[in-house]
């Protein structure tokens, strides 16, 4: 006797979802033109000949600011549903949110103290 009755559609969907990307990659390997590695590595600037190199180094500070932004952006994503359902959640959820915000404030203070937010 099969114990997973009712899951046939899910299994079929899962197999199709796994097969479509594999089929797309295999089709690309078969159909794509080969031997144009030199052209492929050139910088494209609207059909014009590129001026200068495209491989430049960015200052690591950009990554630090981006990382701090992502952290607080994720905080917003987590706090928005909490704020919408604030009246129904009660005191325990409020305390959990305060702990979450406190952890992020401590992380911000740590980053600030280490100089991650200063451009020097």
UniProtKB/Swiss-Prot annotation:
The chain crosses the membrane at residues 10-30, 64-84, 89-109. GO terms for cellular component: NADH dehydrogenase complex; plasma membrane-derived thylakoid membrane. One of its GO terms (biological process) is photosynthesis, light reaction. It catalyses: a plastoquinone + NADH + (n+1) H(+)(in) = a plastoquinol + NAD(+) + n H(+)(out); a plastoquinone + NADPH + (n+1) H(+)(in) = a plastoquinol + NADP(+) + n H(+)(out). InterPro entries: NAD(P)H_OxRDtase_bac/plastid, NADH_UbQ/plastoQ_OxRdtase_su3, NDAH_ubi_oxred_su3_sf. It comes from the Bacteria. It is found in: Cellular thylakoid membrane. Its main location: membrane. GO terms for molecular function: NADH dehydrogenase (ubiquinone) activity; quinone binding. Its EC number is 7.1.1.-. It is a multi-pass membrane protein. Signal peptide: none annotated. Belongs to the complex I subunit 3 family. NDH-1 shuttles electrons from an unknown electron donor, via FMN and iron-sulfur (Fe-S) centers, to quinones in the respiratory and/or the photosynthetic chain. The immediate electron acceptor for the enzyme in this species is believed to be plastoquinone. Couples the redox reaction to proton translocation, and thus conserves the redox energy in a proton gradient. Cyanobacterial NDH-1 also plays a role in inorganic carbon-concentration. NDH-1 can be composed of about 15 different subunits; different subcomplexes with different compositions have been identified which probably have different functions. This is NAD(P)H-quinone oxidoreductase subunit 3. It comes from Prochlorococcus marinus (strain MIT 9301). The lineage of its organism: Bacteria, Bacillati, Cyanobacteriota, Cyanophyceae, Synechococcales.
């Amino acid at each position: 006797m099969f114990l997973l009755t009712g899951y046939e559609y899910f299994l079929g969907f899962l197999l199709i979802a796994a097969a479509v990307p594999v089929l797309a990659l295999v089709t690309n390997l078969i159909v794509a033109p080969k031997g144009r590695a030199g052209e492929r590595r050139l910088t494209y600037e609207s059909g014009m000949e590129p001026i200068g190199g495209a491989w430049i180094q960015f200052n690591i500070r950009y990554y630090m600011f981006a990382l701090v932004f992502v952290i607080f952006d994720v905080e917003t994503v987590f706090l928005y549903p909490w704020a919408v359902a604030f009246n129904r959640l009660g005191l325990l959820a409020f305390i959990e949110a305060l702990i979450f915000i406190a952890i992020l404030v401590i992380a911000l203070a740590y980053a600030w103290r280490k100089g991650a937010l200063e451009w020097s």
